[in-house]
């Protein structure tokens, strides 16, 4: 309650509020409908997203792989992803694919490894803890696509980085995600915590290279037009200039 009180007071006394997408704007509007809220989308530095090494060679991966990048946390949907990958391997019998999970532990690591062992997927799933930034960047470029099966996100950056390499994204139709990952435009959205839906989406992209290319290109164009650091800086500067001009005219 105390936190909500201060958030409300800050919003009420702000000249303007920057929201990363329509979902965030709706949240702020619910707190104070009279606030000036401008959408300034998150942007990535495209110049920094350049692969400098051979990821597969470094980690001795001899097959295609799909990628997860994020915290080892329950809310990131890793459990759902592992169960979906189990369906891919053991029910759908897609054998020439591996899953790479990259990130840092947020309390779920031991449970994650336990589930991988329980499902006998230790040889099929590669977990890279505390990966160097260069390794993450090279992984984007060599992956087939990214999977972000989160239970919730506000405005995730990881899909934008994947788009920069023309890699589509499978994610969930939850909270702010659909404003970044657009279903059947630059990725595929499924319901959160639904391993069957997720496995079907994974299989769909694995079996259709033309669709992967189409969605990946759309994501690439989205980042270059709207979600890069230059656009973000220009839009932020314009907002500051508008605030200064309005204050001078008062």
Predicted regions: what they are:
Residues 130-131, 138-143:
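Short alpha-helical donor nucleotide-sugar binding micro-motif in glycosyltransferases
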Residues 111-131:
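Nucleotide-activated donor-binding/catalytic signature segment of Leloir-type glycosyltransferases, i.e.
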Residues 44, 69, 98-113:
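Glycosyltransferase donor-sugar binding loop
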Residues 151:
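Aromatic "clamp/platform" in nucleotide-sugar-dependent glycosyltransferases that forms part
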Residues 60-76, 82-85, 100:
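Conserved donor-binding/catalytic core segment of Leloir-type glycosyltransferases
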Residues 168-171:
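Short hydrophobic beta-strand element within catalytic cores of glycosyltransferases
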Residues 183-184, 188-195, 204-210:
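Conserved acidic donor-binding segment of nucleotide-sugar-dependent glycosyltransferases
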């Amino acid at each position: 309650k105390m936190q909500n009180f201060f958030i409300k007071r800050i919003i009420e006394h702000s000249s303007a509020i920057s929201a990363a997408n329509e979902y965030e704007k709706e949240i702020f509007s619910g707190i104070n409908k009279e606030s000036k809220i401008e959408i300034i989308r998150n942007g990535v530095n495209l110049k920094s997203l350049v692969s400098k090494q051979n990821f597969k060679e470094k980690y001795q991966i001899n097959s295609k792989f799909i990628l997860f990048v994020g915290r080892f946390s329950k809310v990131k949907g890793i459990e759902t992803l592992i169960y979906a990958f189990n369906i891919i391997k053991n029910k759908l019998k897609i054998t020439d694919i591996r899953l790479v999970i990259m990130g840092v532990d947020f309390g779920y690591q031991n449970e994650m490894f336990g589930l991988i062992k329980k499902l006998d997927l230790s040889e099929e799933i590669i977990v890279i803890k505390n990966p160097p930034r260069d390794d993450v960047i090279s992984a984007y470029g060599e992956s087939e696509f990214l999977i972000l099966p989160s239970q919730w996100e506000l405005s995730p950056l990881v899909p934008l980085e994947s788009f920069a390499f023309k890699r589509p994204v499978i994610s969930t139709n939850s909270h702010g995600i659909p404003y970044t990952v657009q279903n059947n435009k630059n990725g595929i959205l499924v319901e959160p915590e639904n391993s069957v839906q997720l496995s079907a989406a994974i299989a769909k992209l694995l079996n259709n290279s033309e669709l992967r290319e189409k969605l990946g290109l759309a994501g690439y164009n989205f980042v270059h037009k709207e979600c890069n650091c230059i656009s973000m800086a220009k839009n932020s500067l314009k907002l500051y200039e508008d605030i200064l001009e309005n204050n001078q005219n008062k």
